[in-house]
C-alpha cells in the first residue's frame, strides 16, 4: 500500500533538489537504466566447481 501511495504522490508532485529546481528523472538517471542489449545478451554460464565436504576421505 505504501508503494501505491508513493507512486500516486510522485505523479502529482514533481521532485525538487535542495535548491528548489525541478529534477527530470528521465534525463538525469538515463545512464543508470539498462539497455535492451544487456537484457537480451546470452552468455554461457561457467561450470560450477566441485566441492567435497566429506572430511573422512582426507587423511
Swiss-Prot record:
The keyword Lipoprotein applies. Myristoylation and palmitoylation (probably on one or more of the nearby cysteines at the N-terminus) enable membrane-binding and Golgi apparatus-specific targeting and are essential for efficient packaging. It comes from the Viruses. InterPro entries: Herpesvirus_CEP3. Residues 40-59 are annotated as: Disordered. Pfam families: Herpesvir_UL11 (PF10813). One of its GO terms (cellular component) is host cell plasma membrane. The keyword Metal-binding does not apply. It is found in: Virion tegument; Virion membrane; Host cell membrane; Host Golgi apparatus membrane. Keywords: Host cell membrane, Host Golgi apparatus, Host membrane, Lipoprotein, Membrane, Myristate, Palmitate, Phosphoprotein, Virion, Virion tegument. A lipid is attached at residue 2 (N-myristoyl glycine). Belongs to the herpesviridae cytoplasmic envelopment protein 3 family. Interacts with cytoplasmic envelopment protein 2; this interaction is essential for the proper localization of each protein to the assembly complex and thus for the production of infectious virus. This is Cytoplasmic envelopment protein 3. The lineage of its organism: Viruses, Duplodnaviria, Heunggongvirae, Peploviricota, Herviviricetes. The gene is 38.
Amino acid at each position: 500500500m505504501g508503494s501505491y501511495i508513493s507512486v500516486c504522490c510522485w505523479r502529482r508532485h514533481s521532485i525538487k533538489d535542495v535548491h528548489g529546481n525541478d529534477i527530470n528523472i528521465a534525463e538525469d538517471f538515463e545512464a543508470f537504466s539498462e539497455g535492451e542489449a544487456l537484457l537480451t545478451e546470452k552468455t554461457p554460464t561457467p561450470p560450477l566447481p566441485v566441492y567435497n565436504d566429506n572430511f573422512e576421505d582426507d587423511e
